[in-house]
């Protein structure tokens, strides 16, 4: 429940106001508002005068603060009073609908989650009830339910705010949170939402990469060019997941490219292998484990040693889906390692002409 949806705010009353003040506020609004708008004010008054409903409004209101500071906070201002974790989280929740996510605010919210206390909220509510003349709150266990609702609302609001960020900024924010080591409830919700949002594109890119590896068997240059393009996008999308979980997120793609590099170096020669391992290094050098493997492979390749293949990374389907959005494979000039196949073709054609052309 946001401040501006709260019955206290709708009636312009505070949690220290009694039944008479609530009735007076309702009468005042009825004089000012058109008849069709009276329903919301009447419902707000009914909510505050029924004790079983009132407690929720009290929890999501700056109860415990003086009237001036409470309304200042509700309007988005800064109170001079020291705020409890609950009130700081309420302020954070209300800012999410208008503000962009900031790293400092998220880190503070994670700390406030840990310090959130049902007893502190209960004390604020009971104090204001005594001033208002309402009976004491007799079911303190209900506060824990409101606390969970607050956490869920903040999670939903933060996810919505993260989706409004530019794509690159959203990824940077998640990576920064992971590097801070603050992997609490809020961070987990944000990362899970991001993973769901990019799941479809990552799956498509994995298929594109498998397609590029497939065509590289007959067209190494074109396959490598397409592979570089699709892998860069895949790695960009995967960086927040890598920051959280480590290299295993990228291992399938890395292993598939490495195995193809080994296969092509054995079939087409060392120069082709060097170019493929150079691409592998360009893509994955930021991962220490992969960088070490690539360096070791490059040394073995230079020495003419046989390179051990790893497990196949990307799961092979019975029938590879040919991407519809790839209209043609990239056109590239033949490099040194591929020219010999052209020479072989010319020689074969010449022999055929000599044998059968006469």
Segments from the language model and where they lie:
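Intrinsically disordered, low-complexity regions enriched in small/polar residues
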Residues: 10, 136, 148, 355-358
